[in-house]
Structure formats: structure tokens, C-alpha cells
Regions:
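Non-catalytic helical/linker scaffolds that mediate oligomerization, partner binding
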Residues: 1-471
């Protein structure tokens, strides 16, 4: 069973039922809808299509809404585009002006208050670089450090700066409400810099019927990296947004940052998605480059929970083949990883009963060479805790409702199984767990299965039992 999950962005190339169904069969686990693009009407068609296909295929396909987030952009130029040279003076203004070779308006009204002399301003994904020399009222006077072409509405970023713009925009709120109405499983919150950003999203979801929607914080700047531990306290996991991150930090540091973030999340028991340009060349070509193959494999070696496709699956020529290729690379890489010694050597923090039971379950499964671990969980929390230890044993996550079943699709090494029966006793609980293991795996007489769960009070967080069964 493939352990590392695959997140796919759904766009024009993958919006038909036929193509999406083939992607699901090829290995798609989570369908991502990017709300930086498209209208609600267009996204409604995607929501309807995803729900229809996953119901027909009887597969636990989760739905992720990716927010636009707090974006900063230049506005427009009289002639659509300009060319700047190194050393040119240039002004950003919060006034409305017709842009030219000397000045352009910006989308964020408070920018002049948040920047300081000496700050760096990156435009167009960091291709054009400015240094702030003076600020007068609404005018931010800069010097061009690295020249290049600028055109309408290009993105801006500010390395090592936390701007004071309100994190949740009205558009993001409208999008979240729309997503809640459509039963989303995850929110990927863009440009998270601090714990409070996640808490703002959490509060909004809780107040509008999205209490069970899990938050994935997108780490896309240096401040997010610096605050990742406190951010993880408030969310279910992170996404390593290597595109914007590669603009904000020196590109040569990206591999080390990726390894650091993956390790941090794994030790904290949080999911981590590695994203951006993993198989970028397959937007146009039927085969990946050798470098892309190594990139995907290295993320798997690092221990990522999931790898993600963006333009490859949303707008590429070969969406199904791209998923097949991703799954093939992941599966082949996992064959060459000896997970047990890595698990034994790791210094995990055991903070509570669920942590302790989950760790003991994994130790026992390795000690007796179990064929499967079966975890019964009301909320999915115990399944996630077992998943964090990255053991070689296949994990079957038993969900008692569809919402949890879908969300388990993003957990490393977990095969979600839906069992909506009421567990009236621990005997019934473990009977159903063993039945799920037999149904999901090719077990032979003599095979050991380790099962864990809680009492049958119907209260989440009561995991306190371990049982070993021999087939």
C-alpha cells in the first residue's frame, strides 16, 4: 500500500467526471480547489463533480479549499508594461495613479506605514527587486536593485516583514462560507505567518458551521518558518509552499528548509504537504525530468505526509498520467526505505495518553512483525497519532462517519475504512476492527494484527486499549 498521499489541484484539465474518476483510480487522495482563481459558480461545478465521483467509486476522496489569502499586488500601467534597469529610481504609492516608468499604485492601503527604509520589495515572483530609500506619506521611494519587466497586477512580497493587513479578507470569508456549505474537509490557509492567523480562520469556521473542517497552514515566508512550532499548535498540518517560499528566502536554502519543516511536523504529530513544481514539466510533456523524479523521491525520503500537483493536474495536458507517474515514483521510493530503524531512533515527545497508547501500539506492531495496525477513532485523532510514527506496518483507520473517513485520506500510511455501526462494547469494537483488517488486506492464518481504540462511551479522545489478534 502506498503510504505517502497525493493532493491534486482540480482545474480545466481535470474538471470532467471521466478524467477525475481516472485520477482517483490512479492514486488521487485529496482534491484541491484553488480559490485564487475562478468564480463560485465554476467551483460549484467542481464540488458537485467531486462528490458525485467519490460516491460512485466509493473512495475516501477529501476536498481541500485553498484560500486566496492576503495578497499584495501592484496595479496597472498606462502602457500595460514597463522595463526597469538596475539603479533606476521608482516609487510605489497607495494613491490611485496611472503607472509608468517612475511610479505605480499598490493594492494595500497601509503599505507605507508598514515598510521601513532599507526594506526589500520583490515584484513578479522576485524577478524585479527594489530597496526602500525613503517614505513620504503615501509614497514609498525605492531604488531598483535588479531590473526587469513589470506588467499589470504582478505580485509583491516583502522578505522578513510581517505587514499589519487583517489576515482574513472579505473574499476569504465568502469563500470559506461557500466551502462550508459544500462540505469541505480541509482549508489550506495561504500566507500564514503566525499562530493568530490560524486562530482567526478557526474562529470563523467554528462560528459558521465548519467546526470539523481541518486547517492546513501554508508556510510561504520566513516569518512562517520562524513561527512554525506555534503555528502547528493551532492547525492540523502545514503545506510547504515552495513557490512563494523560494521568493522570500534564498533559493539555495529551500532543500534544508523543506527537511526542517517535514521533520518538525512529524515530531509534532502534524501532517505536512510538499507542494509546487514537483512534476512541472508534465504540464506539457508526457514524462517528467530526472530532476523532478528526484525531487518527489526526496520529499518521500524526508517523510512528507503528501506530495501535491498544481498546474500539472489543473491545466496540464496529461492530468491522469501525471498522477500515475507521481504514484509510481512514490511507491518505488517507499520500497527502499527501512522505516522501522527510523522509528526506533526518533525521539518523539509523548505528552498524553493518546500519544503513549499510539506509540506503544507501533512498538508492539514492530516487535511482533504485525501485518496491520487497526485504529478505531471517533474523530480521527488517534489515527493521526499512530500515523505520525511512520512505522512500516500498514495502518487501517476505522471511521464511524463519512466526514472522518474523508479526512483520513490525508494521513500518511493510513487506509481509511468506513464502519458506521455503533460500538456497544469493546468486544464489538475489536470484532469490527478485525473484520475491517481481513476485508482490506490479504491476511493469512498466523498473521498478527494490532488493534487500538477507546472505551465505547462515544467520547472522542478516550483511546486506552491495545489488543493483539492472530488470524
Amino acid at each position: 500500500m502506498r503510504k505517502t498521499k497525493i493532493v491534486c489541484t482540480i482545474g480545466p484539465a481535470s474538471s470532467s467526471e471521466e478524467v477525475f474518476a481516472e485520477m482517483c483510480r490512479a492514486g488521487l487522495n485529496v482534491a484541491r480547489l484553488n480559490f485564487s482563481h475562478g468564480t463560485h459558480a465554476e467551483h460549484q461545478q467542481k464540488f458537485d463533480m467531486i462528490r458525485k465521483v467519490r460516491r460512485e467509486l466509493e473512495l475516501p476522496i477529501a476536498i481541500m479549499l485553498d484560500t486566496k489569502g492576503p495578497e499584495y499586488r501592484i496595479r496597472t500601467f498606462k502602457n500595460k508594461e514597463i522595463m526597469l534597469k538596475d539603479g533606476d529610481p521608482f516609487t510605489f504609492t497607495t494613491r490611485q495613479v496611472d503607472g509608468d516608468e517612475t511610479i505605480v499604485s499598490v493594492s494595500y492601503a497601509g503599505l507605507a506605514n508598514d515598510l521601513s527604509v532599507g526594506d526589500t520589495v520583490l515584484v513578479n515572483n522576485g524577478l524585479v527587486i527594489f530597496e526602500v530609500e525613503n517614505i513620504e506619506g503615501t509614497e514609498i521611494h525605492c531604488r531598483v536593485v535588479t531590473g526587469g519587466e513589470l506588467s499589470d497586477c504582478k505580485s509583491m512580497s516583502f522578505p522578513h516583514k510581517v505587514l499589519e493587513q487583517v489576515y482574513l479578507s472579505e473574499q476569504d470569508k465568502d469563500d470559506l462560507l461557500f466551502g462550508i456549505q459544500n462540505g469541505i474537509d480541509f482549508v489550506a490557509a495561504s500566507f500564514v505567518s503566525r499562530k493568530q492567523d490560524v486562530l482567526d480562520v478557526r474562529r470563523f469556521l467554528d462560528e459558521h458551521g465548519g467546526r470539523d473542517v481541518e486547517i492546513i497552514a501554508k508556510i510561504e515566508n520566513q516569518t512562517g518558518i520562524d513561527n512554525v512550532e506555534e503555528i502547528c499548535q493551532a492547525c492540523s498540518g502545514i503545506m510547504i509552499g515552495r513557490g512563494d517560499l523560494g521568493v522570500e528566502v534564498p533559493f539555495a536554502e529551500l532543500p534544508a528548509i523543506q527537511k526542517y519543516l517535514i521533520t518538525k511536523c512529524r515530531l509534532l504529530g502534524k501532517r505536512v504537504i510538499t507542494a509546487t513544481e514537483m512534476l512541472e514539466s508534465m504540464i506539457h510533456n508526457p514524462r517528467p525530468t530526472r530532476a523532478e523524479i528526484s525531487d518527489v523521491a526526496n520529499a518521500v525520503y524526508d517523510g512528507t505526509s503528501a506530495v501535491m500537483l498544481s498546474g500539472e493536474s489543473a491545466a496540464g495536458k496529461y492530468p491522469v498520467r501525471t498522477v500515475q507517474t507521481m504514484a509510481e515514483i512514490v511507491e518505488e521510493t517507499e520500497k527502499h526505505i527501512d522505516y522501522e530503524p527510523l522509528f526506533r531512533a526518533e525521539a518523539f515527545q509523548i505528552k498524553n495518553m493518546v500519544d503513549a497508547i499510539s506509540h506503544a501500539t507501533c512498538c508492539m506492531a514492530c516487535d511482533i512483525h504485525a501485518k496491520a495496525i487497526v485504529v478505531s477513532s471517533l474523530s480521527g485523532a488517534t489515527v493521526r497519532m499512530v500515523s505520525r510514527f511512520r512505522v512500516p506496518v500498514d495502518i487501517i483507520g476505522m471511521a464511524t462517519n463519512e466526514r472522518v473517513w474523508y479526512r483520513l485520506a490525508l494521513s500518511w500510511g493510513v487506509q481509511p475504512v468506513l464502519c458506521e455501526e455503533t460500538f456497544t462494547s469493546t468486544d464489538v469494537l475489536f470484532y469490527n476492527a478485525l473484520r475491517a483488517a481481513k476485508k482490506s488486506m490479504h491476511l493469512q492464518p498466523g498473521d498478527n494484527v494490532v488493534m487500538t481504540g477507546g472505551n465505547t462511551t462515544g467520547t472522542s479522545g478516550n483511546t486506552n486499549l491495545i489488543k493483539v489478534e492472530t488470524i
